Amino acid sequence: MNINANLVAEPIFSSFEKDGETVEVVNFVLVKKYGKGKEYINCAAYGEKVETAKDFEEGDLIHIFGYFKDREKDGKTYKNFIVKSYNKIEKKENKEEE
């Protein structure tokens, strides 16, 4: 699934141990606007994909590719987007030659 949306806040970087190895993770939230409505998308990227998010800033337009995964915690179901690949979409500046 491909989604283009804006970054709500600065990404959060952390790590955890799995099978005796440290796994890097970045979590971030995107907002996709639909007419008068909004959808917030909780995203997570792991391993070497973490590096890409270090240049992201609040408000950036981000393209993500991956899949949604439901997770249960404290009796609630959370929907997270697992990122397979992603990048910042650069804004095109109109340059007028004089």
Task: Show the residue positions of the predicted features.
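Single-stranded nucleic acid-binding surfaces, predominantly the OB-fold ssDNA-binding core
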Residues: 1-98
